[in-house]
Amino acid sequence: MVRILVVDDNPSVRHYLRALLEQRSTWQVCAEARTGKEALQRVVKNRPDMILLDFQMPDLNGIDVARQISSLFPEIPILMVTIHLSKQLAEEARRVGIRGACAKTDVGSIVEAVDALLHQGTYFPTMSAANR
């Protein structure tokens, strides 16, 4: 069973991501967090196999959270799931150890990205010219 931590300040988005992920019989959301600080606590307590992480949260942004998690647990793949996806954000995400990024609204890419990261890959979609 793959244990996944879902981090988003919006409870509706956390519910949506949980429902999406748990359609796979081998994926289980082991914990949820609504802030960056909660995410750090949940990682230490639950030791997930993977993390889905929002970019914009009330206390710390996803880049700062990922930087801290990656320094402590570099083996845990992090997928940034955001509505703020841009080429610049994706490049910054790579630099801090995030292994993938996709739009919250793209159900297909979320599942595809999780699959890629679980198989030691990365997932950064090609950005359109408007986002460069």
Segments from the language model and where they lie:
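Conserved acidic segment of CheY-like receiver
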Residues: 1-13, 17-21
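Active-site residues of response regulator receiver
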Residues: 8, 54, 82
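Acidic catalytic/metal-coordinating carboxylates
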Residues: 35-38, 61-64
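Active-site beta3 strand of CheY-like receiver
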Residues: 46-52
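The feature encodes the CheY-like receiver
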Residues: 58
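Short amphipathic alpha-helix used as the core "switch/output" element in two-component signaling
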Residues: 63-74
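Alpha4 helix (beta4-alpha4-beta5 surface) of REC/receiver domains from two-component response regulators
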Residues: 64, 85-102, 108-112
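A short, hydrophobic beta-strand element within the central beta-sheet of small alpha/beta folds
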Residues: 75-86
